Amino acid sequence: MAPIPVTLITGFLGAGKTTLVNELLRTPGPRRLGVLVNELGDVGIDGELMGEEADGVVELTSGCLCCSVRGELSDSLTSMARIEPPPDGIVVETTGLADPGPVIDTVAWLPDLLRLDALVTVADARTCLRLLDDPELGEARRQVELASTIVVSKSDL
């Protein structure tokens, strides 16, 4: 079996990551997607918004993907990749506070099962420059630096 492509969706809080994931899930086509959602809050709103479009939504709520839940992320990705039949792709939506580097590393540690297909960073047009200039928000800069694609959201507001 060829490694399953993983699309990592990052972006700072409120940028529109879940909206983008929902659009990916609604895109017609004969494909099965697995979705992993990282939520830091007590209520996993993002997972609830996914609705029934996803073939499998796994919510990681015990911490940020970039640090405390790396083992849980690896376990969840491995389990999802081994579902029969396996998904055609896996979408991982990080919390807005995540440095994507460790998540990329986790995918790289599973080369027989997974390959990083894209790192998409969603940037809110109204707040992006301010966030990138804030020295305390290195995660925002890192999300943009590592992105293979940047989607500018809310440009019409």
Q: What does each model-identified segment do?
A:
Residues 2-10, 15, 19-140:
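Nucleotide-state-sensitive switch-loop elements of NTP-binding domains
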Residues 94, 122-126, 147-157:
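G-domain G4 guanine-recognition motif of GTPases
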Residues 100, 141-144, 148-152:
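Hydrophobic, well-ordered secondary-structure segments
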Residues 132-136, 144, 154-157:
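GTPase G-domain guanine-specificity segment
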